[in-house]
Amino acid sequence: MSLEIVLITGMSGSGKSVALHALEDAGYYCVDNLPPELLSAFVELEHGRHSNKVAIAMDARSAGGLPHLPGQLERLQRQGVVPHLVFLDATTGTLVRRFSETRRRHPLSQGPVAEGRRALVQDIETERELLGDLREKSHVIDTSHLRSSQLQSYIKELIAAPVGQMTLVFQSFGFKHGLPSDSDYVFDVRMLPNPHYEPQLRPLTGMDAPVAEFLRQQPGVDQMRRDIQQFLESWLDMMASNHRSYVTVAIGCTGGQHRSVFLVEELARHFAPRWPTLCRHRSLDSRPTLKPADLLAHDV
């Protein structure tokens, strides 16, 4: 029986505990804070004992063992085990707010629990530097504006994607909510006609037929779709040959409700027959974002 491994890493306070809970609900045997140097030995030991699906969380608490991780991953690949690598991130400002609101100590902190902002920012930036190489090898999810249910949904979508084949992730967003840091390519479509100014279309989204019909009739919309499509078609094969597991393409309009959503749906529909494809609409759900206490419960 083949073994499925999901390796969750990322910044402290970014939501690794939420991700592990989602994987546990999906039937994974979960282990938090495994020393990186024990990864291949642990996988070999656990093979067939608990489950054929294992999720492991690693972060800066195991900073001393991180240099061993590339070798451990290569050893797993030689054994025919290719893990999903997922890196959870958030902006420094978001992480500072989460730690400050919960009054928890950052794992790299040498000071008191309620350390000053300057010291906390320094700890976060040190952690970001420590994990930089690992981030480059992983699929990145920016949790800065996500609710816990959104993050859980993203994780479950990722584990359903085939390992060893590049997956395209198309995501819409609104520039007024900030630029998503987990994107490989970002396209700005704010110059296109905006359905927001049509009263009957304002409450709808780019997934609704009246909005789609409106946009298909507007000058420049189809040209934008074809330009993005042509760019990706020109380079996707080369990206895949470079052993990329995921490519995240973000399309942004002002609010992330109409134009970007429509184009994401159109592009995903076009590429889905050839590539595993995921869709995300970051700005559509305006409900509260992840609570700091939920995010930090097991991250520090």
Swiss-Prot record:
Keywords: ATP-binding, GTP-binding, Nucleotide-binding. The keyword Acyltransferase does not apply. ATP binds at G10, M11, S12, G13, S14, G15, K16, S17. It comes from the Bacteria. SUPFAM superfamilies: P-loop containing nucleoside triphosphate hydrolases (SSF52540). GO terms for molecular function: ATP binding; GTP binding. Pfam families: PapZ_C, RapZ-like_N. GTP binds at D59, A60, R61, S62. Displays ATPase and GTPase activities. Belongs to the RapZ-like family. This is Nucleotide-binding protein Daci_5422.
